[in-house]
């Protein structure tokens, strides 16, 4: 079996997420808050016979939450420190049907049509391009299976570059937030019947957000300064910051998209009619 080709920004991903692993599910962050995980579980409607892939899983918060509801779970991630953290949590919870596997979404180490459900959460904004990861997620999903993507939605068009610039200041592994239309186009091109495309606002503390990535003090001040400037009537950042009790907060716009795969060939998009 040939060695998986590494994504172009893999060193930045390893560096960022090795640092984040220990605090990735911190109560100060909302990324793994139980109400959001429960919302995802309700949306997926998994069956006890399902084989599930949690791709770019991080610590496997989604996979671990879904583990009691399905036959088996694979949590795939590029960063070993994240997998170690997730594996320890799964063992502590007594989850016996879950595996943690190191690998890349761009080259998933499983055969075609291996899973009934494929989910990836907060990953696409780290991918240099969308097509290859989507094609691989599509390839390993069975016909009739569910492909669930949860990610941050891009700001309005004239603010996208500015928002991504600030995101990259905070986390150099960030590439760009994608729009609802960009995701919808992929689902359509690969022949999915889209069942859900829903928006949720996630409240985020600016300090906790920067603490997670261990953002250097100089950059923290720059980012906070940009947020403060917007609050004072200056240039918009795309974050729509607000002050609560002396602390800066903003909302992340999360999209949840769920599509059911059609019966076309595993690795190929559907041909456009006509």
Model-derived features with residue positions:
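A short SAM/SAH-binding and catalytic strip from SAM-dependent methyltransferases
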Residues: 116-129
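Class I SAM-dependent methyltransferase SAM/SAH-binding core
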Residues: 53-107
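A short acidic, Gly/Pro-enriched loop at the edge of an enzyme's catalytic core
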Residues: 106-117
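A short glycine-rich, Lys/Arg-flanked "PGG" loop and its adjoining helix->strand segment in the class I
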Residues: 131-143
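Short alpha-helix
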Residues: 176-191
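Conserved class I S-adenosyl-L-methionine
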Residues: 1-47, 61-65, 82-85, 93, 148-174, ...
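Conserved Class I S-adenosyl-L-methionine
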Residues: 195-274
């Amino acid at each position: 079996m040939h060695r998986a080709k590494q994504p172009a920004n893999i060193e930045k991903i390893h560096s960022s997420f090795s640092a984040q692993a220990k605090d990735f599910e911190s109560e100060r962050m909302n990324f793994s808050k139980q109400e959001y995980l429960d919302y995802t579980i309700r949306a997926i409607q998994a069956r006890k016979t399902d084989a599930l892939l949690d791709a770019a899983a991080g610590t496997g918060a989604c996979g671990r939450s879904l583990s009691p509801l399905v036959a088996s779970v694979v949590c795939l991630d590029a960063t070993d420190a994240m997998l170690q953290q997730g594996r320890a949590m799964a063992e502590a919870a007594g989850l016996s049907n879950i595996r943690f596997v190191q690998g890349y979404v761009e080259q998933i180490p499983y055969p075609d049509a291996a899973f009934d459900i494929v989910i990836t959460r907060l990953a696409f904004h780290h991918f240099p391009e969308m097509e290859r990861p989507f094609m691989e997620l599509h390839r390993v999903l069975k016909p009739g299976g569910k492909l669930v993507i949860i990610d941050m939605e891009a700001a309005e068009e004239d603010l996208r570059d500015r928002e991504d610039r600030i995101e990259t200041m905070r986390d150099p592994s960030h590439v760009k937030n994608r729009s609802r239309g960009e995701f919808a186009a992929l689902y359509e091109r690969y022949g999915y019947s889209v069942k859900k495309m829903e928006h949720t606002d996630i409240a985020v503390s600016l300090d906790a957000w920067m603490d997670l990535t261990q953002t250097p003090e100089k950059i923290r001040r720059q980012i906070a300064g940009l947020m403060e400037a917007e609050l004072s009537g200056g240039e918009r950042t795309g974050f729509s910051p607000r002050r609560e009790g002396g602390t800066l907060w903003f909302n992340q716009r999360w999209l949840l998209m769920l599509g059911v795969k059609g019966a076309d060939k595993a690795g190929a998009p559907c041909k456009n009619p006509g």
